[in-house]
């Protein structure tokens, strides 16, 4: 803790120079201050107003209906991560101004109630409100962005952005969404909003020439990297062990267990086995159960506040929230969303895509993941370095929060050579979301400070 505070003091001295020899620089924005701050705001004030993440944790991600959380209710999943972010920072829960939870499948009023229950399970008092947000697969990231925006607006000082999904408890409709407005059939774009996600994956593969081999290779790499991350033990930094139970489906006997490892990863995944799988959504297509994300159970939570408050409390800073963007794309190829959202988010942060050191891009389907990476000409050694949703799983509402925890802990491990990171995902009905983060301790002696090449205007 003392070392973290000393690092912050070092940066403060750089941002608030007293030597007259530096007077010519006093009107220039700090390299680490928000790129769009107005001229009246001093670098010192802008620095203190940064929205920072002081804790980000997740549960393990488990196979729906077959994995370690198959008999764990969503409010119990959420409670575990809500409790972790306050206990591990020694924060008084009553100081939290709001808890925003991303969640997708469950009926809205039911899940809102469950999230309030989870807050009580985690020890939060009556005074702390809770709400849910649903922007499909970006819901967890949207929750974090909503909290960051509310803190910046002055609505409250401390907030938690979280996500939860129990796809064991709540199921995606197998036959599509019922009760849609019949008028949608008269509007092609509206009709395309109702397409099964797997068909949109096939559309991306066909329109942009993503081959079955490319998709299977991406799947193998995802499992390989996830297995290596688990074997190394590095994911213990971000995963909260959850004490729960599993129920034998035949005898109904209950067994107490502790879940702390992602259980959908297949270390022996290989091209030969994947090539044997039949396509799922279209005859002679290319999307299979092996190169698409898994349905999963899990939760994540992210604790945010202003940098000035974090420093006052002596909390080490894990990351800085720099920008967030959501963009619309054609519903029939919704998976291309990251290819549009990532440049939008980096531009808002005053950066170019080439300035980003690490990416977490949700692998909803290998087709759209491969396309997005190729379109942006990304260095694949910087993308999903610990595996992605094909291997780990995709609990819809929790994925955004899971990615924040994974990205920021990996950036911390990499140190001074990893300053900026991006999280992105596609969104059903045709959207993409992306956020830019800066490593929290990137101010160590300003050893890695560099001028961003992007246009900040």
UniProtKB/Swiss-Prot annotation:
Transit peptide, start-end: 1-37
Listed under catalytic activity are: an acyl-CoA + acetyl-CoA = a 3-oxoacyl-CoA + CoA
One biological-process term from Gene Ontology?
A: oxylipin biosynthetic process
List the expressing tissues: Expressed in seedlings and wounded leaves.
Q: Which Pfam families match?
A: Thiolase_C, Thiolase_N
What residues sit in the active site? 137, 394, 426
Q: Which UniProt keywords apply?
A: Acyltransferase, Fatty acid biosynthesis, Fatty acid metabolism, Lipid biosynthesis, Lipid metabolism, Oxylipin biosynthesis, Peroxisome, Transferase, Transit peptide
Pathway annotation from the record: Lipid metabolism; fatty acid metabolism
Where does this one sit in the cell?
Answer: Peroxisome
Its GO CC terms?
peroxisome
Q: Which GO terms describe its molecular function?
A: acetyl-CoA C-acyltransferase activity
Q: What induces it?
A: Induced by jasmonic acid (JA) and systemically by wounding. Slightly induced by dehydration.
Annotated EC? 2.3.1.16
Q: How does it assemble?
A: Homodimer.
**Which family would the database say this protein is a member of?**
Belongs to the thiolase-like superfamily. Thiolase family.
Q: What does this protein do?
A: Probably involved in long chain fatty-acid beta-oxidation prior to gluconeogenesis during germination and subsequent seedling growth. Involved in systemic jasmonic acid (JA) biosynthesis after wounding and may be during senescence.
The protein's name is 3-ketoacyl-CoA thiolase 5, peroxisomal
- The protein's organism comes out as Arabidopsis thaliana (Mouse-ear cress)
Gene field: KAT5
């Amino acid at each position: 803790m003392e070392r973290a505070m000393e690092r912050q003091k070092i940066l403060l001295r750089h941002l608030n120079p007293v030597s007259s020899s530096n007077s010519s620089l006093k009107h220039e924005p700090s390299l680490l201050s928000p790129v769009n701050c107005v001229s009246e705001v001093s670098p010192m004030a802008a620095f203190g107003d940064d929205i920072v993440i002081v804790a980000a944790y997740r549960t393990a991600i488990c196979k729906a209906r077959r994995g370690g959380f198959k008999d764990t209710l969503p409010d119990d999943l959420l409670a575990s991560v809500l409790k972790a972010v306050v206990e591990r920072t020694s924060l008084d829960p009553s100081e939290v101004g709001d808890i925003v939870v991303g969640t997708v499948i469950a009926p809205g009023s039911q899940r809102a109630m469950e999230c309030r229950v989870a807050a009580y399970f985690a020890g939060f008092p009556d005074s702390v409100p809770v709400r849910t947000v649903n922007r499909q697969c970006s819901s967890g990231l949207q929750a974090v962005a909503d909290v960051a925006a509310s803190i910046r607006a002055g609505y409250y000082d401390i907030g938690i952005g979280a996500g939860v999904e129990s796809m064991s408890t709540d199921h995606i409709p197998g036959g599509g969404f019922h009760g849609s407005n019949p008028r949608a059939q008269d509007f092609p774009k509206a009709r395309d909003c109702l397409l099964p996600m797997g068909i949109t994956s096939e559309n991306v593969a066909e329109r942009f020439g993503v081959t079955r081999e490319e998709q299977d290779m991406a799947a193998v790499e995802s499992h390989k990297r996830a297995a290596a991350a688990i074997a190394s033990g590095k994911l213990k930094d971000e995963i909260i062990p959850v004490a729960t139970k599993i129920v034998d489906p035949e005898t109904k006997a209950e067994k107490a267990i502790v879940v702390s490892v992602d259980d959908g990863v297949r270390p022996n995944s290989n091209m030969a086995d994947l090539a044997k799988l039949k396509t799922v959504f279209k005859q002679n297509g290319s999307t299979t159960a092996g190169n698409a994300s898994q349905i999963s159970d899990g939760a994540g939570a992210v604790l945010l506040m202003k940098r000035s408050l974090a420093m006052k409390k002596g909390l080490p800073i894990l990351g800085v929230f720099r920008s967030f963007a959501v963009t619309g794309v054609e519903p029939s190829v919704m998976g291309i969303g990251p290819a549009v959202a990532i440049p939008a988010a980096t531009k808002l942060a005053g950066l170019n895509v080439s300035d980003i050191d690490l990416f977490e891009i949700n692998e909803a389907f290998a087709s759209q993941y491969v396309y997005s990476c190729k379109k942006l000409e990304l260095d694949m050694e910087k993308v999903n370095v610990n595996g992605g949703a094909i291997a780990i799983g995709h609990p819809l509402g929790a994925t955004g929060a899971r990615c924040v925890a994974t990205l920021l802990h990996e950036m911390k491990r990499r140190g001074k050579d990893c300053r900026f990171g991006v999280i992105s995902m596609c969104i059903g009905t045709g959207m993409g979301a992306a956020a830019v983060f800066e490593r929290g301790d990137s101010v160590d002696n300003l050893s890695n400070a560099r001028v961003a090449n992007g246009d900040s205007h």
